[in-house]
């Protein structure tokens, strides 16, 4: 086998990945999706949340939850019924084993630095 036949696919892959990384603001077909676009995994969305309303609905990219909004803690599944909190907020939730397995541990976004009572 010729060395050219081995190196060509590697060079093409590096070129494709390099061009993709060099144009981060461009709208993507699979990654870098805007809010409202169909998604399969949270990693595809600019916002960091692939949201679905029910178990049979199509998931779409959505903004992260703001303070006092309902949220899901970060998990290993690709989609959320409620988006995780924005940066600087935490999702206060009572976790359970069943809730972790069935993705039904929900809470509300809170600012831990907020000192008002």
UniProtKB/Swiss-Prot annotation:
Main location: secreted
Localisation: Secreted
Protein name: Colipase
UniProt-listed InterPro entries: CLPS_chr (IPR047576), Colipase (IPR001981), Colipase_C (IPR017914), Colipase_CS (IPR017915), Colipase_N (IPR017913)
Cysteine disulfide partners in this protein: 39-50, 45-61, 49-83, 71-91, 85-109
Coiled coil stretches, renumbered: none
SMART domains referenced in this protein's UniProt entry, alphabetically: COLIPASE
Function: Colipase is a cofactor of pancreatic lipase. It allows the lipase to anchor itself to the lipid-water interface. Without colipase the enzyme is washed off by bile salts, which have an inhibitory effect on the lipase.
The keyword Chloroplast appears for this protein: no
Gene giving rise to this polypeptide: clps
One of the record's GO cellular component terms: extracellular region
GO MF terms, alphabetically ordered: enzyme activator activity; lipase binding
